[in-house]
């Protein structure tokens, strides 16, 4: 039987939900009105908290304990956001803007535009 998010992450689940809300609220504040061409730079935004099965699989591959506390301590992607943009330039502009926000810290980024995954 699969664990629920609450069972796996325990009390940290509610903190993860709050982090997810902060990220989404911040993204909604992106100054899109500054775009003279009128094209909305963010087509849509999707967020998630990594599901327990995926997190356990990731931790097993790393050879560490598979509990929720270890997951939060040892990984950087318990909470994730995907922003789909109208144009490639918008991706870099939004990424740069996010890095200037002071209500969270970006721990790691991966540039799959410049360096696509091999699959």
Regions found by a protein language model. Name each.
Residues 1-75:
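Charge-rich, low-complexity segments
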Residues 79-85:
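Short cationic amphipathic helices and targeting signals
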Residues 72, 85-119:
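Long beta-strand-rich cores associated with HINT superfamily self-processing modules
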Residues 63, 80, 117-119:
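Glycine-centered flexibility motif
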């Amino acid at each position: 039987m699969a664990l629920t998010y609450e069972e796996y992450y325990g009390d940290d689940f509610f903190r993860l939900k709050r982090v997810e809300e902060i990220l989404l609220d911040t993204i909604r504040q992106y100054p899109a009105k500054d775009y003279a061409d009128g094209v909305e730079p963010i087509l849509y935004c999707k967020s998630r908290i990594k599901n327990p099965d995926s997190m356990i699989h990731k931790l097993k591959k790393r050879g560490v304990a598979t509990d929720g506390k270890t997951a939060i301590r040892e990984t950087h992607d318990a909470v994730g956001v995907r922003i789909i943009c109208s144009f490639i330039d918008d991706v870099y502009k939004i990424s740069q803007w996010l890095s200037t926000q002071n209500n969270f810290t970006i721990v790691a980024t991966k540039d799959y535009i410049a360096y696509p995954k091999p699959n």
